[in-house]
Curated annotation (Swiss-Prot):
InterPro entries: Cyt_trans-like, NadD/NMNAT, Rossmann-like_a/b/a_fold. GO terms for molecular function: ATP binding; nicotinate-nucleotide adenylyltransferase activity. The keyword NAD applies. The gene is nadD. It holds the Pfam family CTP_transf_like. Its EC number is 2.7.7.18. It catalyses: nicotinate beta-D-ribonucleotide + ATP + H(+) = deamido-NAD(+) + diphosphate. Keywords: ATP-binding, NAD, Nucleotide-binding, Nucleotidyltransferase, Pyridine nucleotide biosynthesis, Transferase. This is Probable nicotinate-nucleotide adenylyltransferase. It comes from Staphylococcus aureus (strain bovine RF122 / ET3-1).
Length: 189
């Protein structure tokens, strides 16, 4: 049975902390396949400074090239509009019948899982991998995996704000992503 990890997020933009999460999960679980799953629109997030999806996909590919593993699952992008993880996982599972699916979330998402659409069915389809960046270890449900990672206080919101203020984002994102953001004039206003 194949072990497949799905790491969802807006990735607007993808940054160094996302890379750390991906790397820690990849090396801990050693999956057969690892997918970044960019959302078109998350039902539980604000959509400020929304850029063209192609820019996000390009930056994710840059991260994949740098990490040396991973692929992009663009199911939610193709579907457009608001995407629910349940619908995405259900469709993905139909394409990957003989697979164990692992879905990466942060403690912030873990704490609001009960708000997720069809969460009880979703829990039956995937094993949640809860990534914790706090000092204290995370207590999770028995059917979930908790992975402690180094705390890195970087957010996509912070990066967008720094760019709009003309501040440096060096080391917050890989050089390739920094150059891309500057070259395309992303997040400048």
């Amino acid at each position: 049975m194949k072990k497949i990890v799905l790491y969802g997020g807006q990735f607007n933009p993808i940054h160094t902390a996302h890379m750390i999460v991906a790397s820690e999960v990849f090396h801990e679980l050693q999956p057969d396949e690892f997918y970044f799953l960019p959302s078109f629109m998350s039902p539980l997030k604000k959509h400020n400074n929304f850029i063209d999806v192609q820019h996000r996909l390009t930056m994710i590919q840059m991260i994949i090239d740098e990490l040396g593993f991973g692929d992009i699952c663009d199911d939610e992008i193709k579907r457009g509009g608001q995407s629910y993880t349940y619908d995405t996982i259900k469709a993905f599972k139909e394409q990957h019948k003989d697979s164990e699916l692992y879905f990466v979330i942060g403690t912030d998402q873990y704490n609001q899982l009960e708000k997720w659409y069809q969460i009880e069915y979703l829990k039956e389809m995937v094993t949640f991998v809860v990534v914790n960046r706090d000092k204290n270890s995370q207590n999770v449900d028995n059917a979930m995996i908790a992975i402690q990672i180094p705390r890195v206080d970087i957010s996509s919101t912070m990066i967008r704000q720094r760019v709009s203020e003309g501040k440096s984002i060096q080391v917050l994102v890989p050089k390739s992503v920094e150059n891309y953001i500057k070259g395309e004039g992303l997040y400048e206003h």
